[in-house]
């Protein structure tokens, strides 16, 4: 079990980014499994948007990390963090990480995982702790429905309600970039 919020966050993000790139067959924890499931649902629902983000990585981890910081600042400026916005930020960063990996930048995904973990644990750590940390994430995304079909539908609605403004902010930032 990780010793700190930053360490736990880094491990979860590294697992998700590896999974997103086709590796990491089994999730190392229930939290990692929930993150994968919720992220896959958001990415499926907003596939065209996230696909349009991939070219923004530009095969350079520093540029991708700078873009991540801009997007995080924009989300914060547009009303702060919530679980949906956090998830949208993770999926957005996972898209950049996968694009870097596909372009041959092996250190890109781990650098982005470290940058996002630092942002979430250091700049948003108080918010995360107030909302139950990653256990709170699992409670938020895992509480919807008991049947798989019902759960997926309700999960989709919950994600989109919580992430809607975050995705709009991401899209705005990317258009004006």
Swiss-Prot record:
Q: Name one Pfam family in it.
A: Bcl-2
Q: Name one GO cellular component term.
A: plasma membrane
Q: Where in the cell is it found?
A: Cell membrane
What top-level branch of life does the organism fall under?
Answer: Eukaryota
Tissue expression, per UniProt?
Expressed preferentially in heart, skeletal muscle, retina, optical tectum and bursa of Fabricius.
Q: Which UniProt keywords apply?
A: Apoptosis, Cell membrane, Membrane, Transmembrane, Transmembrane helix
Q: Which organism was this protein described from? A: Gallus gallus (Chicken)
What function does this protein fulfil? Shows anti-apoptotic properties. Counteract the pro-apoptotic activity of BAX.
Transmembrane regions? 86-106, 156-176
Relate the assembly described in the record.
Answer: Interacts with BAX.
Primary localisation category: membrane
The UniProt entry annotates the motif BH2 at 126-141
Motif BH1, per the record, lies over 75-94
Q: What PROSITE patterns has UniProt attached to this entry? A: BCL2_FAMILY, BH2
The terms under GO molecular function for this entry are: channel activity
Q: What is this protein called?
A: Anti-apoptotic protein NR13
**What are its GO biological-process terms?**
extrinsic apoptotic signaling pathway in absence of ligand; intrinsic apoptotic signaling pathway in response to DNA damage; positive regulation of apoptotic process; release of cytochrome c from mitochondria
Q: How does it sit in the membrane?
A: Multi-pass membrane protein
Record has Membrane as a keyword: yes
């Amino acid at each position: 079990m990780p010793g700190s919020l930053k360490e736990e966050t880094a491990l979860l993000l590294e697992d998700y980014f590896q999974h997103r790139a086709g590796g990491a067959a089994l999730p190392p924890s229930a939290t990692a499994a929930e993150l994968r499931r919720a992220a896959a649902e958001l990415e499926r629902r907003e596939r065209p948007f996230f696909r349009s983000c991939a070219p923004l990585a530009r095969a350079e981890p520093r540029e991708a990390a700078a873009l991540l910081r801009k997007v995080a600042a924009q989300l914060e400026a547009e009303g702060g963090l919530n679980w949906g916005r956090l998830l949208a930020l993770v999926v957005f960063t996972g898209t950049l990480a996968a694009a870097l990996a596909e372009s041959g930048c092996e250190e890109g995904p781990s650098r982005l995982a470290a940058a996002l973990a630092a942002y979430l644990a250091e700049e948003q750590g108080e918010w995360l702790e107030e909302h139950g940390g990653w256990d709170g994430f699992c409670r938020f995304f895992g509480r919807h429905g008991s049947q798989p079909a019902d759960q997926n539908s309700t999960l989709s609605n919950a994600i989109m309600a919580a992430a809607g403004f975050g995705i709009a902010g991401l899209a705005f930032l990317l258009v004006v970039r």
